[in-house]
From Swiss-Prot:
Residues 527-547 are annotated as: Disordered. It comes from Rhizopus delemar (strain RA 99-880 / ATCC MYA-4621 / FGSC 9543 / NRRL 43880). The lineage of its organism: Eukaryota, Fungi, Fungi incertae sedis, Mucoromycota, Mucoromycotina. Its main location: membrane. This is Spore coat protein homolog 1. A lipid is attached at residue 584 (GPI-anchor amidated serine). Glycans are attached at residues 82, 397, 440. The keyword Membrane applies.
Length: 609
């Protein structure tokens, strides 16, 4: 009897057709969109004519496959679904939600940042969101073709893995348009209407990543920093459309010099009565005293001007860094534990356009709700992993101990490293980061899996002819893969600066750091003597082994999924999930600045130093 019941149960589950909700994004659709189930076409409809997002219901048996048909053209692959609703799928993309990308380990957990909002699905890197801007056609063409500094009112629709959000009355513009050496593929910014937020943010920026053939470096940098327990910007890859015209794939990220980022990452969206001073660090923003504090450009809503940086810089200059008690004191007014983590990453990636080497692309936030504590802000992580690096290739082997002599302008990190305890902490962070994340055993599978997932969108991106004026490198789709392992030369008028492969750099830096640490006193780095206010981590991670394919192309036979390189259309991609199926699955409160705030900051610092 039990056997009979089991057979009946199996029969029912394999023959019963359930009503399923289908959702697909089809930007190129001109007429009709259908879901095809065993030759039966069911039409899907778009509720908003501005957004090519088609939905509908159809009967689907358990284990039955389906695909989408747009204007008579069917996807050349089948999809499988477990559940009563698809995720927000994209036409001709075989993998909607990645399940085979390894998770990077979280390290340096003691003292890691916990104040920020990072859990929203818009930052889920296993999905590629789609963003649709709807604006006046004449204004949008003017913006694209003439790269105006004007901003325009638009409607912006954000489609995530499960949800769709539309905001009317957004302000859209280009990020720093019209500069002499801008790339034709522009970067964009927009603000949500006053009082409206998404993921506790009301300001978004997307960067083009044209300097990097792989388009992976900048997001990878931020991903690693957050795994190191920092408050680094969130980032995710997105598809971007203006009036249904595809502009390409971009890196959407927090703009750290905007209060949107501060509100989300420092206060979980619970905005305090008074926000602190916020600054964009331009060239020369070194924190040195005496120095040019005009390099710190206050946010237009900042209640403090650039002179509020001076008391900290002056006090920092007076510190005797051989005295632990003085270092402990300054830790109350400068989160240098977080700063050390940022500097470890700058060193490992050879970030030549950041704080340590050039004193630029940084920033600062003064939290007036926490004793005017200063937080270092890092931004724009594109000049990393060997991209556009003018140093000789031997530079990858240079020890961090040589940096103070090579780059004397980085006074914050150079002086902190004069303290033996801080130096030990820095070396411990460096060692753990290389052992646990910054090595080819970890990053090799992670980076190649991310490339596999993004490959159809990278090929689409490389096929777009940009209508804006500017530099065109002409990186090919094949080079998005090749530059993971070796240098490549752009076929355009400018040959580009991709002389290093991304993983080639990682392998070389991993080898150099391990060699340095093994020949120094870092043999006992796990028993570091900590300086108060700069905690390290407990335990000694196991030593990683070199990823065997660090300097060669990833062997398709050894990968957990495969794809054909150099095919003519995204539909030719073969993506095999481990399970064997294709899964589808600006308004911030502020009050006017008052002079006593600056005086108070000066008094507080003077009383401690």
């Amino acid at each position: 009897m039990k056997s009979l019941l089991f057979v009946v149960f199996i029969f029912l589950t394999t023959t019963y057709a359930a009503k399923v909700s289908f959702k697909v994004i089809a930007p190129d659709a001109k007429n009709r969109v259908h879901v095809n189930i065993n030759g039966v076409l069911v039409e899907l409809k778009a509720s908003d004519p501005d957004v090519p997002y088609y939905t509908g219901f159809a009967e689907l048996k358990h284990g039955q496959s389906y695909n989408y048909v747009v204007d008579g053209n069917a996807e050349p692959f089948k999809r499988l679904l477990n559940g009563s609703s698809t995720k927000n799928e994209f036409f001709n993309r075989p993998v909607t939600y990645a399940t085979n990308i390894p998770e990077l380990p979280s390290i340096l957990t003691e003292g890691s940042w916990t104040r920020g909002d990072t859990s929203n699905p818009i930052w889920d890197s296993n999905y590629v969101p789609s963003i649709f801007v709807t604006g006046n056609p004449r204004e949008m063409n003017e913006l694209i073709e003439n790269v105006k500094k004007n901003t325009y009112k638009t409607k912006i629709t954000f489609i995530g893995p499960e949800t769709i959000n539309t905001f009317e009355g957004c302000t859209l513009g280009l990020h720093k348009p019209g500069r002499k050496h801008n790339d034709a593929k522009q970067s964009w910014i927009w603000a949500l209407p006053e009082g409206q937020f998404m993921a506790n943010r009301n300001w978004f920026k997307i960067r083009h990543m044209e300097e990097d053939p792989t388009q992976l470096r900048e997001k990878l940098y931020a991903d690693i920093l957050r795994k190191m327990g920092t408050y680094a910007n969130e980032a995710n890859m997105v598809r971007f459309f203006i009036n249904k015209e595809g502009m390409g794939i971009f890196n959407m990220l927090d703009d750290v010099i905007m209060y949107s980022y501060i509100n989300a990452m420092f206060y979980h969206g619970d905005t305090p009565e008074q926000l602190g001073g916020l600054y964009d660090g331009a060239s020369g923003a070194s924190f040195n005293f005496p120095g040019d504090f005009d390099s710190f450009i206050p946010n237009v809503e900042s209640p403090l001007d650039q002179d509020a940086i001076e008391p900290f810089s002056k006090a920092f200059t007076s510190i005797d860094f051989l005295e632990d008690e003085q270092v402990k004191t300054i830790g109350k007014y400068f989160d240098y534990d977080q700063f050390l983590r940022f500097m470890v990453m700058e060193f490992l990636t050879g970030d030549w356009d950041g704080y340590w080497q050039e004193q630029t692309n940084d920033g600062a936030y003064i939290d007036i709700n926490d004793h005017n504590k200063i937080y270092y802000l890092g931004q724009d992580f594109d000049a990393t992993f060997g991209v556009n690096l003018e140093q000789k290739r031997e530079f990858v082997n240079v020890s961090y101990t040589e940096y103070p002599k090579l780059f004397p302008g980085g006074v914050l990190i150079n002086r902190l490293l004069q303290n033996p305890g801080v130096k030990k902490t820095f070396e411990n962070y460096l060692k753990i980061t290389v052992q646990e994340i910054f090595n080819n055993a970890t990053l090799g599978p992670y980076v190649t899996a991310r490339h596999e997932f993004l490959a159809p969108d990278l090929q689409w991106d490389r096929s777009i002819k940009q209508r804006s004026p500017g530099n065109i490198f002409g990186w090919t789709f094949e080079q998005t893969y090749e530059n993971l392992f070796e240098g490549v030369t752009a076929p355009g008028k400018n040959s580009g600066g991709a002389d290093w492969g991304l993983l080639e750099w990682v392998a070389a830096k991993e080898k150099a750091v391990k060699s340095y640490l093994s020949s120094s006193e870092a043999a006992d780095a796990a028993t570091v003597t900590q300086v108060p206010e700069a905690p390290g981590t407990d335990g000694t991670p196991s030593e990683s082994t070199a990823w065997p394919h660090a300097n060669t192309r990833f062997r398709q036979a050894e990968a957990s999924n495969t794809h054909k390189i150099g095919t003519s259309s995204p539909s030719n991609f073969i993506v095999k999930i481990k399970q064997g199926t294709v899964s589808s699955s600006s308004s911030i409160k502020r009050t006017p600045c008052i002079l006593p705030l600056v005086i108070l900051a000066s008094t507080l610092f003077a009383s401690f130093f």
